[in-house]
């Protein structure tokens, strides 16, 4: 007998669909406690009290050389708005006699270590740690980069508690130099795109080895950590499920395929309704960064006239697309919206498109 499923009535209806033959394999991937819809526990990942005290961004964000604290924020905050930044950069509160930061870096939530990179030169992240949080829905990752050192004994598969020390803030990096006076913690919250990332990576022929497996930064899509934390503090949202549900759509597209991407299997909280008995495609809603935050399964009747494995853009917020210059999701060609380069990358990773 299958036990009663957890969560809200809507959540239970969605999870119910995974009991079908189509969904049973994916059901095994559901995180423990994924249906819990209460208020999550999350903390600022450094000792600085500035954000907790409600002080302005200049008191806790590290600028990227411009002197403007906004350049340490999320999104198109650099190079006059055309350079995208996946997370936020948090400045140190204390330094040692050599001027090196001495702040501990904490786990923002309880979770499981998925990746530890102790070699500073192997990534633009420098030394970094990735946690996955299976007790929240969707089961986001958090990432902690540019560390001076990683806490002893921290390895993939280790369970960590909220506020557990992961390492020491630093300015490690690969391929470029972060000056000591701009040392910081690069902090991300987001979703992992595909378990088939290596196939996508190999097809791109980057000319370098993937040293980080699934937790390569190219396989990770972040949300704005500061925006989430501020909405959570103000009690506008209690958890990530509520936060994703109120995201602003930038692009809505339809993809005709009988395939269920592993992204959906891992993040069933993003399903808008249960799967039909015979899946014919997906309607996918993306925010301005291209993150696919809402998935609606389609029946054959809903896909009439559309071509298999060819994305069809059915709605584009043209104003938002023009405003956000660090991402290109949609391009007008011959009077028709088509996927831009950043949306193409998302679809390639999700569906194995070439």
Regions found by a protein language model. Name each.
Residues 91-94, 142-151, 171-176, 206-212:
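Short helix/strand-bridging catalytic loops that position acidic/His residues to coordinate divalent metals
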Residues 123, 128-131, 158-236:
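Conserved, short, structured surface segments that act as functional micro-motifs
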Residues 26-35:
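Hydrophobic h-region of N-terminal signal peptides that target proteins for export
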Residues 92-94, 135, 149, 187, ...:
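Non-catalytic surface loops within mature trypsin-like serine protease
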Residues 10-22:
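Bacterial N-terminal signal peptides that target proteins for export
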Residues 108, 154-160:
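Short, well-ordered loop/turn sites that connect or cap secondary structure elements
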Residues 100-102, 108-151, 180, 184:
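Zn2+-dependent peptidoglycan hydrolase active-site motif and core
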Residues 36-127, 211-354:
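Surface-exposed, glycine-biased beta-strand/turn segments
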């Amino acid at each position: 007998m299958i036990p009663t499923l957890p969560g809200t009535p809507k959540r239970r209806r969605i999870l119910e669909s995974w009991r079908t033959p189509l969904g049973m394999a994916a059901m095994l991937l559901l995180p423990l406690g994924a249906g819990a819809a209460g208020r999550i526990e999350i903390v600022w990942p450094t000792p600085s009290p500035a954000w907790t005290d409600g002080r302005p961004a200049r008191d806790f964000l590290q600028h990227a050389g411009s002197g403007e604290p906004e350049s340490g924020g999320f999104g198109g905050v650099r190079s006059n708005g055309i350079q995208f930044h996946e997370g936020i950069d948090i400045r140190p509160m204390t330094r040692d006699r050599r001027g090196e930061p001495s702040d501990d870096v904490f786990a923002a939530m309880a979770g499981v270590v998925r990746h530890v990179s102790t070699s500073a030169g192997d990534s633009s992240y420098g030394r970094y740690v990735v946690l996955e949080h299976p007790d929240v829905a969707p089961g986001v990752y958090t990432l902690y980069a540019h560390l001076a050192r990683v806490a002893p004994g921290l390895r993939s598969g280790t369970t960590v508690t909220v506020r557990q020390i992961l390492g020491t803030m630093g300015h490690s990096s690969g391929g470029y130099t972060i000056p000591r006076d701009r040392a910081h913690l690069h902090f991300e919250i987001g979703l992992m795109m595909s378990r088939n990332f290596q196939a996508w990576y190999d097809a791109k022929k980057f000319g370098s080895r993937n040293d980080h497996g699934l937790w390569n930064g190219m396989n990770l899509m972040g949300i704005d950590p500061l925006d989430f934390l501020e909405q959570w503090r103000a009690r506008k949202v209690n958890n990530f499920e509520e936060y994703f549900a109120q995201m602003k759509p930038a692009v809505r597209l339809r993809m005709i395929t009988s395939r269920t991407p592993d992204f959906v299997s891992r993040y069933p909280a993003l399903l808008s309704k249960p799967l039909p008995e015979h899946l014919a495609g997906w309607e996918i809603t993306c925010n301005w960064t291209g993150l696919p935050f809402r998935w609606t399964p389609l029946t054959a009747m809903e896909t009439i006239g559309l071509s298999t494995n060819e994305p069809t853009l059915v709605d584009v917020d043209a104003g938002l697309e023009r405003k956000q210059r660090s991402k290109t999701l949609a391009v007008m060609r011959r009077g028709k919206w088509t996927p831009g380069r950043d949306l193409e990358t998302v679809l390639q990773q999700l569906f194995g498109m070439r």
